[in-house]
Amino acid sequence: MKRIVYIVFLLLFFGCNPLNKTARVNHKPISKEVFLEQPFGFDEDIKSFSENTSCKFRIQKLLRKNKHYPEKTDTIYQFKYRKSEIFFYKTHLGQEFLLAGKILNKHIVLTNDVKVGLSKENFQNRFSNQLNMASDTLEMIGDGTKYTFIFEDDKLHRINIDNYFD
């Protein structure tokens, strides 16, 4: 019985470690533009996301009618881990896009080791640009994408992802 409890404890403890730590733990300052090109450090598609994260995501498929072609059906993939969610949109033609997300868990790591729990100072040190940190919310806006970083008590508390396309 003790052996089973020990094994379960180990599985829970090591259940969500990043697979590719060397690619993420760079800590050399990068520009906001470089960050927004590949915020996860890999292509933003379902296969890459599944292969490059080790969190035990629950995946749910949601069907949606294509607004331009109502006879066609697209699919939204919802990846859930605890209170965090990442959504991918897959068109009827097979194109995939990172649609949206909310990250509330430190085990979901973005490029340059940006993650929930990071101090404001360490967050600023990850970027070569001067960041306007006058408030507890910072938005990084790129071509068709917006990342909102929300701080509480000088620690990164939440990351919101909003991508838009037509």
Spans of features found by a protein language model:
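Short helix/turn-capping signatures at newly exposed starts of structured segments
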Residues: 17-136, 155-166
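Short, exposed beta-strand-loop hairpins at the edges of beta-sheets
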Residues: 137-155
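Bacterial Sec-dependent N-terminal signal peptides
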Residues: 1-25
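N-terminal leader/targeting segments
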Residues: 3, 10-11, 132-133, 138-142
